[in-house]
UniProtKB/Swiss-Prot annotation:
Class of the enzyme per the UniProt entry, highest EC level: oxidoreductase
Limits of the Fe2OG dioxygenase domain: 205-306
Cofactor(s) the record lists: L-ascorbate; Fe cation
Record gene name: GA3ox2-2
Gene Ontology molecular-function annotations: gibberellin 3-beta-dioxygenase activity; metal ion binding
Function: Converts the inactive gibberellin precursors GA9 and GA20 in the bioactives gibberellins GA4 and GA1.
Pfam families in the record: 2OG-FeII_Oxy, DIOX_N
Protein name, entry field: Gibberellin 3-beta-dioxygenase 2-2
Keywords for this protein: Dioxygenase, Iron, Metal-binding, Oxidoreductase
Active site: R297
Organism: Triticum aestivum (Wheat)
Residues given in the record as Fe cation binding sites: H229, D231, H287
Amino acid sequence: MPTPAHLSKDPRYFDFRAARRVPETHAWPGLHDHPVVDGSGAGGGPDAVPVVDMRDPCAAEAVALAAQDWGAFLLEGHGVPLELLARVEAAIAGMFALPASEKMRAVRRPGDSCGYGSPPISSFFSKCMWSEGYTFSPANLRSDLRKLWPKAGHDYRHFCAVMEEFHREMRALADKLLELFLVALGLTGEQVAAVESEQKIAETMTATMHLNWYPKCPDPKRALGLIAHTDSGFFTFVLQSLVPGLQLFRHGPDRWVTVPAVPGAMVVNVGDLFQILTNGRFHSVYHRAVVNRDSDRISLGYFLGPPAHVKVAPLREALAGTPAAYRAVTWPEYMGVRKKAFTTGASALKMVAISTDNDAANHTDDLISS
């Protein structure tokens, strides 16, 4: 097991608690190139983050508007017990409060997708982010977490039980939201059933969970919790603590909109592969996480996407007489494209677009300075 002395020299570990300043390794330029506005809707303006209530008979229409205009929305009435969400947040806080030497037992190795460490996309950037993360697959939850708790004691069993309960609730919710998305595209109940019977999207969707801890920062104007990006999969549920920090990018004029921390609500982000599946009618959203001087922040991303071998292409029901804007790709193929995009500054969605002149392919995938 790594000792504290060894950790101080390990480039994979940074002691945020001991930091009295933001070192150059964690200082990001260009963070304030665009203004930041409040997304709570207090003034009733155009920057109010859309809210979808799944109990509302008109929820599909609300999803359609939000997915077309924002690529994200706050989800209420989802049915996941609030006391479970509180237990999930407490479990995450407890995990990140473990001694560094214990967390480093589960450090993510090069090429691995699961484990403890910096955000997975951090390898594409020269600067470090002001956060710690832990990624695991719900399908392999207990084996993944044995790296953190090799003795499988009480803390391990409690954490696994909470996350397994959360996964069951979220997987059921994902199926309901997928159906709502398809209805929002204009599909009838029969068409939704036919799509599922033919393509088995809901049946085969895979899930990944990524836990985030954003420590309070001595100089938040120079640091960034998570770099601006889009999610690669179908869609993501984000559970965040009552400390705001998630921001969505909006055009016309360019600005960052801070998502309000609403008790009991989740954030839903549309991903790149869902933009492809819907032929650009629903679009993915650039988002980032910022830090603050006074409070730690916790979030959990529950990512949904297709199995690795499945080709994702625009649904014919989404074409509505228009040509397909994107070629078919598997998730691993698309991740390879994203890797090239990160290193060249290009747009991954444009790289898989059939025609770069197609409005759907170019809706929101221009890169931004952040």
